[in-house]
């Protein structure tokens, strides 16, 4: 036997009859036609009490062709016991058995009505367009240090070095200061970086000369009345005021270079005995002609 679902109509001759699926265990090769209503009598199996269904006309030739009665006769083999779970179902003429829609209640496999055996469910083939994923690659050896360093993100490149202003490198080199040699003629206009180069050289020369003058003024001021206690030092610092006036004129670069030769840093030389005043050179005597303001705290114009 095979458990199947079969379609059944609610009415045989009604055009508006509805269809429903009826669960049965009927085999398709045991159907008997009723001559009166044009229906089939379905038996569940061929061992149903070993009784066969036949038409009355087959047994008695005098019977009416419209006789609806069904007679049974004993079979030749041993009778089987009747089972309450077995039933007979009627289907209208023209009904079809949908083998493609018959599924077992367990496992979802398709049933065959010919022999009552259950066919295994077919596996769905993979789609043609989908490519099979490659198996995961298993490393045969641990990664080396070079591979580990290659996986790390590269550090950002160092920012480009900022270009130095024109003339700054020559000033830091410690060489003598000199203005730009271009243009050659005195009345020609400056162009390019000439203006910025000459400006940087001028500022460096003034800075060196002013540093030398400040060192000389500070040394002279300290020698006038050197403090001897912390209280004297505080009073001295409050009263000290040194003003530097740079007026070398055209000799600015010469004075700056001479200062650079005596003190490479542009300041007064600091010997083992402390600060020593620079000797009075011709350029220094010319710079002393530029007198500071009258209210200046320290004036060394008359100092010998």
Swiss-Prot record:
Residues 43-58 have a biased composition (Basic and acidic residues). Residues 23-68, 112-184, 262-304 are annotated as: Disordered. It is found in: Virion tegument; Host cytoplasm; Host nucleus; Host Golgi apparatus. InterPro entries: Herpes_UL49. A motif (Nuclear export signal) lies at residues 233-245. Residues 280-289 have a biased composition (Basic residues). Residues 143-154 have a biased composition (Low complexity). Signal peptide: none annotated. Residues 123-142 have a biased composition (Pro residues). The keyword tRNA-binding does not apply. Its main location: virion. Highly phosphorylated in the host cell. Packaging is selective for underphosphorylated forms. Keywords: Host cytoplasm, Host Golgi apparatus, Host nucleus, Phosphoprotein, Virion, Virion tegument. One of its GO terms (cellular component) is host cell cytoplasm. Pfam families: Herpes_UL49_2. A motif (Nuclear localization signal) lies at residues 160-163. Belongs to the alphaherpesvirinae VP22 tegument protein family. Interacts with gE (via C-terminus); this interaction is necessary for the recruitment of VP22 to the Golgi and its packaging into virions. Interacts with gM (via C-terminus). Interacts with VP16; this interaction allows the formation of a tripartite complex composed of VP16, VP22 and UL41/VHS. Interacts with the capsid-binding protein UL16. Interacts with host CGAS. Tegument protein that plays different roles during the time course of infection. Participates in both the accumulation of viral mRNAs and viral protein translation at late time of infection. Modulates the RNase activity of the virion host shutoff protein UL41 probably to ensure necessary levels of key cellular mRNAs and proteins. Plays a role in microtubule reorganization that occurs after viral infection by stabilizing microtubule network. This is Tegument protein VP22. It comes from Equine herpesvirus 1 (strain Ab4p).
């Amino acid at each position: 036997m095979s458990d199947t679902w079969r379609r059944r109509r609610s009415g045989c001759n009604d055009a508006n009859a509805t269809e429903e699926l009826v669960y049965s265990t009927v085999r398709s090769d045991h159907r008997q036609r009723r001559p009166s209503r044009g229906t089939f009598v379905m038996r569940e199996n061929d061992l149903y009490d070993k009784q066969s269904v036949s038409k009355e006309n087959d047994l008695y030739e005098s019977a009416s062709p419209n006789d609806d009665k069904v007679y049974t006769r004993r079979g030749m083999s041993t009778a089987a016991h009747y089972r309450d779970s077995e039933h007979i179902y009627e289907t209208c003429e023209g009904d079809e058995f949908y083998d493609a829609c018959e599924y077992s209640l367990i496992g979802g496999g398709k049933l065959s009505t010919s022999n009552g055996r259950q066919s295994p469910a077919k596996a769905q083939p993979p789609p043609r367009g989908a490519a099979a994923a490659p198996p995961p690659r298993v490393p045969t050896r641990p990664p080396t240090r070079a591979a580990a360093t290659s996986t790390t993100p590269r550090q950002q490149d160092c920012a480009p070095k900022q270009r130095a202003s024109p003339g700054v490198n020559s000033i830091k080199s410690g060489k003598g200061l000199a203005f730009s040699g271009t243009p050659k003629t005195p009345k020609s206009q400056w162009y390019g970086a000439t203006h910025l180069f000459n400006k940087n050289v001028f500022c460096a020369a003034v800075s060196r000369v002013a540093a030398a003058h400040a060192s000389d003024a500070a040394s002279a001021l300290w020698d006038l009345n050197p403090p001897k206690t912390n209280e004297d030092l505080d009073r001295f610092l409050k009263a000290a005021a040194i003003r530097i006036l740079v007026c070398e004129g055209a000799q600015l670069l010469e004075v700056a270079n001479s200062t650079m030769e005596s003190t490479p840093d542009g300041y007064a030389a600091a010997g083992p005995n402390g600060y020593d005043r620079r000797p009075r050179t011709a350029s220094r005597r010319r710079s002393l002609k530029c007198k500071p303001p009258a209210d200046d705290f320290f004036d060394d114009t008359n100092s010998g």
